[in-house]
Amino acid sequence: MKNTSSSTTLTMNDTIAAIATPLGKGAISIIKISGHNALNILKQLTQKQDFTPRYAYVHDIFSNGVLLDKALVIYFKAPYSFTGEDVCEIQCHGSPLLAQNILQACLNLGARLAKAGEFSKKAFLNHKMDLSEIEASVQLILCEDESVLNALARQLKGELKIFIEEARGNLLKLLASSEVLIDYSEEDIPSDFLDGVSLNLEKQIASFKDLLDFSNAQKQRNKGHALSIVGKPNAGKSSLLNAMLLEERALVSDIKGTTRDTIEEVIELKGHKVRLIDTAGIRESADKIERLGIEKSLKSLENCDIILGVFDLSKPLEKEDFNLIDTLNRAKKPCIVVLNKNDLAPKLELEILKSYLKIPYTLLETNTLNSKACLKDLSQKISAFFPKLDTQNKLLLTSLAQKIALENAITELQNAKNHLETLELFSYHILSAIENLNLLTRPYETSQMLDSMFSEFCLGK
């Protein structure tokens, strides 16, 4: 796309424009314009001179006198906008070509094509949002976990900023008190003051650790729980995968060794992301390709969180079953022992199977041919292994930089607590903790750092 703007210097004073909606056809596309020239561009596009801020207008959109579309347009007057500048939105019909043509018209009238994250960067620099709120908005776009939506919404509302500001205010009071007492001799410092400061720090550290622990647990949850499906050939592993997906994803056949590699799919189970890994049947094989698949199956057990060990209930235990039992015992992972094909006459020696299993396990009899019933039973068994996270009234750190800053603040507060009787050192560590807290909401560093941070955001955001 050609930008005909005469300005070649990319500055925060430029008027920028971008398509804010995803690529592809849809009901509408949204073009955003931000900057001192935004309203003038909108006036030229619509051939309308008067716009009341925050009113929606349905109006024709023109480019060089040619009608492009009839669209919904809104003008947000500075500073009452997302970026803090004049912002105009054009909501046109959802043709990608049409949106591109309107965007090009904006560029022809003097706007510059926005860089990734530049709208958010303007909002940050104009003090419309702090870093925690901006990161929450990005994570809301990417979020795939229903349980974390509430925490992100609260962060977007500014509650993390309030929490950090309250903690910073508390530490500033402690710092002021210690600075006053530095000139006193140690014996003149009231013991109850030191006791009160120590208790204050313990509570502050505990609140920070709670935030950090919840954020780390949520990060692990976002990765998803890896669930490996293992068993001898033809035990019903692939049928089990298909039942959980409610579709034919893995090839099902009576021929042993049909699945020769791991197959991975992602599903949501009771609000949790689960990565299902269907593995090659575990048995002794002379086939080189199948052996590689079996080795990969065994490797997947090392990295999984839960194992589904599948046995054929309609057949007596044989060598391959005992090999599987040995594999489960050595893996030492949470295990659900699935007894498949319970629609057939049972021949598997269940008591012998139980006696050989040396790990905690949950037993489930099912029939993978009845997909819906199988999925319901499995969901109950699998979800019992998920850690219970209370997300109500919780705050969340969404970036590694925030977590490192909070970890450093905790370390400094612990150091301060250890140096309570040496007030110079105490003050030094309290001040360092405050500086780390500042990094959570407004990390004042260099323009290069800001460019790098916001470049991870999407266009139009």
UniProtKB/Swiss-Prot annotation:
Residues annotated for K(+) binding in this entry: N234, S253, I255, T258
Cofactor remark: Binds 1 potassium ion per subunit.
UniProt superkingdom: Bacteria
Keyword Translocase: no
Cross-referenced CDD domains: trmE, TrmE_N
A GO CC term assigned to this protein in UniProt: cytosol
Pfam families listed in its UniProt record: MMR_HSR1, MnmE_helical, TrmE_N
EC number from the UniProt entry: 3.6.-.-
Binding, GTP: 234-239, 253-259, 278-281
Cofactor(s) recorded in Swiss-Prot or TrEMBL: K(+)
Residues the entry annotates as binding (6S)-5-formyl-5,6,7,8-tetrahydrofolate: K32, E89, K128, K461
GO MF term (any one): GTPase activity
Primary site of residence: cytoplasm
Signal sequence segment: none
NCBIfam families linked to this entry: mnmE_trmE_thdF (TIGR00450), small_GTP (TIGR00231)
Biological function: Exhibits a very high intrinsic GTPase hydrolysis rate. Involved in the addition of a carboxymethylaminomethyl (cmnm) group at the wobble position (U34) of certain tRNAs, forming tRNA-cmnm(5)s(2)U34.
Subunit-structure text: Homodimer. Heterotetramer of two MnmE and two MnmG subunits.
Protein name, UniProt field: tRNA modification GTPase MnmE
Source organism of this protein record: Helicobacter pylori (strain ATCC 700392 / 26695) (Campylobacter pylori)
Lineage, opening ranks: Bacteria, Pseudomonadati, Campylobacterota, Epsilonproteobacteria, Campylobacterales
